[in-house]
């Protein structure tokens, strides 16, 4: 069982992600913004982070760069899960350190795998 942090401001999407991952045997914690995510990340490190790009308080790419800059978090796998679907967006995500890039809408089987 993995601990997965979901950073997503759309409650419907975060609930789908969380429900699907919990059904696959994982533990999840949902965060609607960067501020609440940083607070928890300082306390406990997850096995995986699912990160949206368009968040209310801070761009997901900025959050990703901060994750990669810190010694204690730089090795945590991060998957961008976003509505930004262009090739340029995907390249930006991967160039900034994302381990993978999924676009919305996504399939539950794709998410769980």
Label each PLM-derived region with a short phrase:
Residues 10-29:
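Two-component/phosphorelay signaling modules centered on CheY-like receiver
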Residues 14, 56, 86, 104:
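The feature encodes the CheY-like receiver
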Residues 25-34, 40-41:
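Short hydrophobic/Thr-rich beta-strand motif most characteristic of the beta2 strand and flanking loop
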Residues 45-47, 72-77:
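His-Asp phosphorelay/catalytic-motif detector in bacterial-type signaling
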Residues 52, 82:
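Active-site residues of response regulator receiver
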Residues 106-113:
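C-terminal output helix
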């Amino acid at each position: 069982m993995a601990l997965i942090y979901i950073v997503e401001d759309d409650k419907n999407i975060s609930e789908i992600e969380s429900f699907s991952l919990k059904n696959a045997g994982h533990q999840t914690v949902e965060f609607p913004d960067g501020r609440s995510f940083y607070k928890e990340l300082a306390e406990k490190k997850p096995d995986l982070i699912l990160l949206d790009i368009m968040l209310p308080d801070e761009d997901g790419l900025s959050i990703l760069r901060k994750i990669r800059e810190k010694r204690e978090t730089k090795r945590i796998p991060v998957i961008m899960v976003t509505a930004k679907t262009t090739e340029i967006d995907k390249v930006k995500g991967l160039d900034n350190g994302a381990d993978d890039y999924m676009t919305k809408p996504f399939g539950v089987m794709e998410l769980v795998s």
